[in-house]
């Protein structure tokens, strides 16, 4: 297996350590469980439905998004470099009777034999955890079919994002383990759109996600100041 070298061992170890609680809706990944319906709806609606489509989930982790896409009829392949998260993902899929092809590999290496193969590629909450985000973006672009969709989500790099996602979510609210995020690795929307454009991915839409700690609810917002998603289309 060729992996290429766009991997941060410390990031892999961080999520390996938490893998056992991946599917606990009240555990360390509670925010992902609560956020996932918004992600799934955005992907499905923007792409015109993913039923019957070939979908690649880059940085799938324990499979929360992968499983939800498979349940609505997508043919899903999940990529990750963490052994423990992949083991958890495979076991949970087996227990729930969902068919997903989980593979240990990087996007760059998987691209070598899968150019233009997927109708939809998702890369959610992953770019801020790799040394070279532009390399992942280019690989995603290379693997999607012309006219296909590539979805990215990450965190904006500004003071508000630092306060909400690190000081708030990690230190005050204890929603995430301390050290989950590094503010220096956050990506501004303008930067992400430029990187996508360089990979011949046209940004069709962008939406923000906001969290209310009182109601414990995530919702869409027009503001891209903190968490956000973009939908891009591969040029024909």
Curated annotation (Swiss-Prot):
Protein name per Swiss-Prot or TrEMBL: Ubiquinone biosynthesis O-methyltransferase
Q: What is the role of the protein in this entry?
A: O-methyltransferase that catalyzes the 2 O-methylation steps in the ubiquinone biosynthetic pathway.
- What GO terms are given for molecular function? 2-polyprenyl-6-hydroxyphenol methylase activity; 3-demethylubiquinol 3-O-methyltransferase activity; polyprenyldihydroxybenzoate methyltransferase activity
Q: Does the keyword Chloroplast apply?
A: no
Q: Which GO BP terms apply?
A: methylation
Q: Which reaction does it catalyse?
A: a 3-demethylubiquinol + S-adenosyl-L-methionine = a ubiquinol + S-adenosyl-L-homocysteine + H(+); a 3-(all-trans-polyprenyl)benzene-1,2-diol + S-adenosyl-L-methionine = a 2-methoxy-6-(all-trans-polyprenyl)phenol + S-adenosyl-L-homocysteine + H(+)
Glycosyltransferase is among the record's keywords = no
Give the species this sequence originates from: Shewanella pealeana (strain ATCC 700345 / ANG-SQ1)
- Please report any disulfide bonds recorded for this protein chain, giving both cysteine positions: none
Under Enzyme Commission nomenclature, its number is 2.1.1.222, 2.1.1.64
Origin organism lineage:
Bacteria, Pseudomonadati, Pseudomonadota, Gammaproteobacteria, Alteromonadales
Instruction: Report residues binding S-adenosyl-L-methionine.
Output: 39, 59, 80, 124
Alphabetized InterPro entries for the sequence: SAM-dependent_MTases_sf, UbiG_MeTrfase
Q: Which family does it belong to?
A: Belongs to the methyltransferase superfamily. UbiG/COQ3 family.
Q: Which UniProt keywords apply?
A: Methyltransferase, S-adenosyl-L-methionine, Transferase, Ubiquinone biosynthesis
């Amino acid at each position: 297996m060729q992996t290429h070298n766009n991997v941060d061992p410390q990031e892999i170890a961080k999520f390996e350590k938490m893998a056992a609680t991946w599917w606990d809706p009240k555990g360390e990944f509670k925010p992902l469980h609560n956020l996932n319906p918004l992600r799934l709806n955005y992907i499905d609606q923007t792409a015109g439905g993913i039923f019957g489509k070939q979908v690649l989930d880059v940085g799938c982790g324990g499979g929360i998004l992968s499983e939800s896409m498979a349940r609505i009829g997508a043919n899903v392949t999940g990529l990750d470099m963490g052994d423990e998260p992949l083991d958890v993902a495979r076991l949970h899929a087996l227990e729930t009777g969902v068919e997903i092809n989980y593979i240990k590999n990087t996007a760059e290496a998987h691209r070598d034999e899968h150019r233009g193969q997927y109708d939809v590629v998702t890369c959610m909450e992953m770019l801020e955890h790799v040394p070279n985000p532009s390399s992942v973006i280019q690989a995603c672009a290379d693997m999607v079919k012309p006219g296909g969709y590539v979805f990215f989500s990450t965190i904006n790099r500004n003071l508000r994002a630092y306060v909400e996602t690190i000081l708030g979510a990690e230190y005050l609210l204890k929603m995430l383990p301390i050290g989950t995020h590094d503010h220096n690795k956050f990506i501004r929307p303008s930067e992400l759109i430029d990187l996508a454009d360089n990979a011949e991915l046209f940004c069709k839409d962008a939406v923000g996600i906001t969290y209310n700690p009182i109601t414990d609810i995530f919702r869409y917002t027009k503001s891209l100041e903190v968490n956000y998603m973009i939908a891009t289309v591969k040029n024909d």
